[in-house]
Amino acid sequence: MKILKRTDIEAIGNRVYTAYRKLPKIAEQNMICAVDPDILLTDLLGLRVDYRHLSIDRRIYGTTSTGAIRVMLCQEDSQEDLYYLDGKTILIETDLQKDSLMAGKCRFTKCHEASHHIYKMLYPHFYGNNNEGIDPVLHFSREPEKRTGIITDWEEWQADVLASCLLLPEELVRQGMYQIGLGEKVECLNRIYCPDVYAKVNTLAQMLGSSITALANKMQRHGLLERNQLYDPYAYWGVYFDIPPNCKWTDPREIKQAYMNQKYGNNK
């Protein structure tokens, strides 16, 4: 397997997005729209998407292979279903398609599995199993386990990174920020102190079919967001203070005054 840096993967994602934008169905769009994984997979990459129950506990979200192979699918009645993957097909868990709350996970899983095919197209001699007489590699996308910060599977990590680049390419994010009135850079994303900016970023995330968390991380990655305080909305200029129990403050000015009182005394 070829080991790629994040910057290398982002460059691949940009190339794929450029080709995607030239597709007839996409080129005629005038407004900023979310990347459509189905058009990307079928019209650009020549892949086919099918839906099946992939496991009894539904913890396998997707599977694919860049070569022809038969895969055994487990059904609820414990019956085994033999499915033939032809090297151009991506299987997605049916429940992801049916549940509207899993729409984001469904989009990501499609692009994750498609990423394996993109790497195979770009690096045919370094990716997958090329030895005759040995079955091709079967890729699985599973329910994520607790993150430890340690990469244990570089192949799946690279597929995750490319999937993120395909769904939120830098060019699309910049265009969306300009269109929605965020300018070239957001100084601080904080729902308490910067509610107007937060509302715009949240609207942009919905436009791009993303969560606000994923969009904020992408913006920060590309230097489009200075301070990401989604998980720290009560941090005032990066300084922390104790919030009394059963606090009902809603006005940022009250929080600011509490910070000033705690730091400098009630007379300030």
Regions found by a protein language model. Name each.
Residues 1-268:
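Active-site hotspot residues in diverse enzymes, especially metal/ion-binding acidic/histidine motifs
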